[in-house]
Structures are given as C-alpha cells and as structure tokens.
C-alpha cells in the first residue's frame, strides 16, 4: 500500500511534554537494533520505503482496571530492543534512519505507576538514531509521506496496514547474531539451574504444582521473571499429553514426570525438556527402556548437526531409531522398518517434529519450517523441500516416545494398526511418555549444545544423592 494522503494516518497524539530525568547509563552493551533493521531491509530486497512498527500497548483485562501481563511484540523488539509498553518505531530505509518513539509524559501515570521512559533514558539504553515522544509521531509520518509518497511504500506488520512485513520477509531472524546467542545462552544457564534444583528436591514433592512452583521460584530469583512458555510438568499418563499445563495432579503412584520448562532472558527463549523418574532409580523396566530409546534418538541426531544438513533427515533418523527400539520391545511388529515408517505407525508414538528454531519466540519464525509434524491418520509422505541448517541457527532437538491412550484407541481403526501390538503398547500407558530436549547452536564445524540441564546418568546421580554439585 502506498500512502498518499496524510489524513489517512489515524494517529491521535496527546500534547507533547518532555520531562528529562537523569539516570545512570546501563553497563550492558546495547541490543543491535540498527543492525537488525538493515538486515530486514536487505531481506525485503528494497532500498527505499519506511518500516513502521507498533509496540505492545498497555491493555487491561476485560471489565477490569487491572493490566494484563506485558509481553513485547517480538517483531518490534527485533528492530528496537525496547521492552517497554506503548512505544513505536520507524526505519527510513533510504536514509538509514531508525527512530524510536516513547510514550508522552503523564503525571498521573508517574504518580500511580512510576514515570514512563524518557527520550534521554531511551538514548542511553537503545541502539537507534533518533528518540522522540509519541506526540511527534503523526507529524513525522506525514512529513515522510509528503516527501516520498510518489514512489516509497510504508511497510507495516499486519494486514490492516498493508503491505505487510511477514514472517517470510523477516526470515533474517533465522540466523542469530552474537548478541542474540548470548541472550539464549543466558536463558539456558538459568533454565539449567532450575532443572537441577527440581532434581535435587523432587523427592520432597507430592504434586505437579510444586514442580512448577520451584522452577518459577528458581528462575525469578536468578533474574528471569518471565518464562518462554507455560511450564509443562506432566506426571504419569499426563506425560503423554504434549502440551499439558494443568500441573495440578498428585505424584503418588506415578512413574515419570515430563518437565518441559525454559526461562526467558531479555525477551530471548530457552526450550528445555527433561523426563525424570519419580524415585532414586527407574520405577520399572518399561520406563527405563523407553528412556533409553529416546536418549539414543537424541544423541544420534545431535552428533550429526552441522551446516548444510537437511533437518528433515534428522527427523527421519529419529523415527527409524524409535521404530527399531519399539520393535525390540514388541510394541511394533509385522513389517520392515521402511514399511512401518511409510504407514505412519511410528507417528502414533512420536507425533511431533524433531525440533524448531529458538529465538525471540520459543518457536521462532523462519521462512520455512525446518521439519514437519507427523500425521496420526494418513500415510507418511516425505518432504524433500525443507531448508538446510545454517551456521548461527539455534534449533531444538527434542525426540519423544509417548503412550497416549486416546491416540492408541483412535489408531485401532487405521490401516497402520496391523503394525502395532496394542496389548503390548497398553502395558506402557503408565509410563506416559519420555521427551528430552536441548537447544543447539549450529557452528561452522558442527554444533554447540547450549543446554546444560542434567539428563541421563548425571540426572540419576543427582536423584540418588551422589552428585558433587
């Protein structure tokens, strides 16, 4: 859309009022917003135009004067580094000019909630060329339109403000820069502390809610106030529900708990899953065997990560390992590995993709997903067009094997049922499921595992009270 009439810019600013407060400049290096703005313009393939993005507004709950928890829009953050409400930005591509607009000063807001960000504070904190109050936004946009409207579009994010900057055009977020990697690394460090704390104290716990509570407490006490996603602490059969978030059932009589939880640091996510025996050792041979299969799936996939690899190939490898392991246990039967894979039978037990990008979102954006989900109701069809891994990507490797009662019942009427021994599979329902997930940075020579949360033998040593840490 080309904006030719300034009157169409529906922005209603308050009167400008600039109150200057002096604060100490942050010792941290600034978020590389200008670099990201240039990167997005490059991916758009244009040398002209204006990128205009709106930050998250302050919003109250319905029928209430209480505000909803604030979470900055990730596209806005990527081009600004601003984690404050009610801000805006413009990036003049031709003139390489990034401008951040902060809220007008409100004395009432300052008295009740504290003062909002000033332009001087913003200048000290953020990497941009200009900092202005919201009151100047409409006139600035109209001036830009008057100067360039004949041949320069305004790029915005949502369909109501076309043309839009879509996930495809912001594929620049696929490859992380040095700053972003540091943030993801820090998020993983705190997540690892929280996961370790759970292992050291789970013998005292009697309900899933206690696991969630201690994980949150550990993260907040180490400066990570926000989680990357809702904590999943599913015990027993709940571990077979991929995004189980009720976290309110007793642990007594359960074999395992699947803890999928990751801290957020400066808006960047971590995504970590550990499956923990509820005791000092494996509660059953069934639980031990399923953990061993998933452990092998993850280890074999992780060691192959490198630039140029098609992630879909790792996804397929994980399925092959799962099929062979379940065949040995007698859960899968009556066919070759290839026949079982083609039928989709392994997707009854491994129904999700092997991984995804991690960044400003826990499932970060990319031009094209690096893998595809399994299918529960149709034959598997390979997808060969999935993209290759690149240096600087941060991805998860998160295989799992689950015994979901509903999924098993539904599959009885499918053609793939001939490959499943349902009597044997139902013996594993008390196990629930096992998932193990790490965050991997793709490097020039292979990978770096950013996730330090204990698993496998180290996990068992902590549960048995033998760990030195």
Swiss-Prot record:
The keyword Hydrolase appears for this protein: yes
Cofactor: binding details: Binds 2 manganese ions per subunit.
Amino acids binding Mn(2+) 1: 271, 398, 437
Amino-acid positions noted as binding Mn(2+) 2 in the UniProt annotation, renumbered to this chain: 260, 271, 437
One family name in Pfam for this protein: AMP_N
Matching PANTHER family: XAA-PRO AMINOPEPTIDASE 3 (PTHR43226), XAA-PRO AMINOPEPTIDASE AN0832-RELATED (PTHR43226:SF3)
The protein's name: Probable Xaa-Pro aminopeptidase AN0832
Organism: Emericella nidulans (strain FGSC A4 / ATCC 38163 / CBS 112.46 / NRRL 194 / M139) (Aspergillus nidulans)
């Amino acid at each position: 859309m080309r904006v030719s009439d300034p009157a169409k810019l529906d922005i209603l600013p308050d009167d400008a009022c600039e109150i200057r407060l002096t604060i100490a400049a942050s010792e941290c290096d600034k978020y590389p917003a200008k670099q990201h703005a240039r990167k997005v313009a490059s991916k758009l393939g244009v040398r002209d135009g204006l990128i205009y993005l709106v930050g998250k507004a302050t919003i109250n709950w319905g029928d209430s004067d209480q505000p909803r928890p604030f979470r900055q829009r990730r596209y806005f953050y990527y081009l600004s580094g601003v984690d404050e409400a009610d801000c805006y930005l413009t990036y003049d591509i031709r003139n390489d000019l990034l401008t951040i607009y902060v809220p007008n000063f409100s004395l009432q807001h300052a008295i009740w909630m504290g003062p909002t960000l000033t332009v001087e504070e913003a200048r000290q904190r953020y990497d941009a060329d200009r900092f202005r109050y919201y009151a100047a936004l409409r006139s600035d946009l109209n001036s830009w339109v008057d100067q360039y409207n004949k041949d320069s579009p305004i790029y915005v994010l949502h369909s109501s403000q076309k043309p839009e900057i879509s996930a495809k055009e912001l594929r620049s977020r696929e490859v992380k820069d040095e700053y972003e990697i540091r943030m993801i690394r820090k998020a993983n460090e705190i997540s690892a502390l929280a996961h370790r704390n759970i292992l050291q104290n789970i013998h005292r716990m009697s309900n899933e809610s206690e696991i969630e509570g201690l994980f949150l407490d550990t993260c907040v006490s180490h400066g990570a106030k926000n989680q990357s996603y809702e904590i999943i602490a599913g015990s027993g059969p709940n571990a077979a529900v991929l995004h189980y978030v009720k976290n309110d059932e007793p642990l007594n009589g359960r074999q395992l708990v699947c803890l999928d939880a990751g801290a957020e640091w400066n808006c960047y996510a971590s995504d970590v899953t550990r499956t923990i025996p509820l005791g000092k050792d494996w509660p059953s041979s069934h639980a031990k065997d399923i953990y061993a299969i998933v452990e092998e799936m993850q280890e074999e996939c992780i060691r192959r990560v490198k630039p140029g690899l098609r992630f879909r190939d790792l996804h397929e490898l994980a399925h092959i390992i799962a099929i062979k392991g379940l065949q040995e246990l007698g859960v899968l039967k009556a066919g070759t590995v290839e026949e079982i894979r083609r039928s989709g039978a392994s997707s009854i037990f491994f129904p999700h993709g092997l991984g995804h990008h991690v960044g400003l979102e826990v499932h970060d954006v990319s031009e094209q997903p690096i893998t595809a989900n399994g299918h529960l109701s149709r034959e598997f069809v390979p997808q060969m067009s999935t993209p290759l891994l690149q240096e600087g990507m941060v991805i998860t490797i998160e295989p799992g094997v689950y015994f979901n009662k509903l999924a098993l019942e539904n599959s009885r009427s499918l053609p793939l049922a001939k490959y499943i021994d349902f009597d044997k599979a139902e013996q594993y329902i008390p196990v629930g499921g096992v998932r193990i997930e790490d965050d991997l940075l793709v490097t020039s020579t292979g990978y770096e595992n950013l996730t330090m949360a204990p698993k496998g033998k180290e996990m068992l040593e902590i549960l048995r009270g033998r760990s030195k840490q």
